């Protein structure tokens, strides 16, 4: 049996677990993320539920990593040819037009953006994700 070692081990590929692994890997710590399914991102991906956030989320009350993720979602839609200019020019808009969340978007987009955030650390070996574990 091959022995593995890590500085940080996170069990749970939820959005919180994924961003915790991202934050740990960013500091250079060898990080293992164990995900229950074959997708990371929890609520935003596997559960297909938009983020449930407080009413001040656009100004305060979240980490820099999550704020960067939110910005990437909106940037994706700003570059989409079918989004009208009046919407593209707003600082904050809900791509899915939801009244439940301020940032409704499809699970596959959430997974794509999360994987893009993790990619440099996956490529360097700083982060390893164990799926369906």
Predicted features by range, described:
Residues 17:
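N-terminal Rossmann-fold NAD(P) dinucleotide-binding loop
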Residues 29-30, 35-133:
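Conserved N-terminal/central alpha/beta ligand/cofactor-binding core
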Residues 2-14, 32:
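Beta1/beta-strand and adjacent pyrophosphate-binding region of the FAD-binding site
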Residues 24:
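Aromatic pocket-lining residues of Rossmann-like dinucleotide-binding sites
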């Amino acid at each position: 049996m091959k022995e593995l070692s890590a500085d940080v081990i996170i069990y749970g590929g939820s959005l919180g677990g994924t961003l915790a692994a991202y934050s740990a890997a960013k500091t250079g710590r060898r990080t293992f993320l164990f995900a229950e399914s074959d997708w990371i991102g929890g609520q935003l991906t596997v559960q297909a539920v938009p983020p449930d956030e407080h009413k001040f989320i656009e100004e305060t009350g979240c980490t820099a990593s999550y704020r960067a993720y939110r910005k990437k979602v909106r940037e994706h839609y700003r570059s989409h040819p079918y989004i009208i200019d009046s919407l593209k020019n707003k600082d904050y808009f809900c791509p899915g037009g939801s009244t439940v969340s301020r940032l409704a978007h499809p699970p596959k987009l959430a997974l794509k953006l999360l994987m893009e955030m993790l990619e440099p650390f996956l490529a360097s070996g700083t982060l390893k994700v164990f799926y369906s574990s």
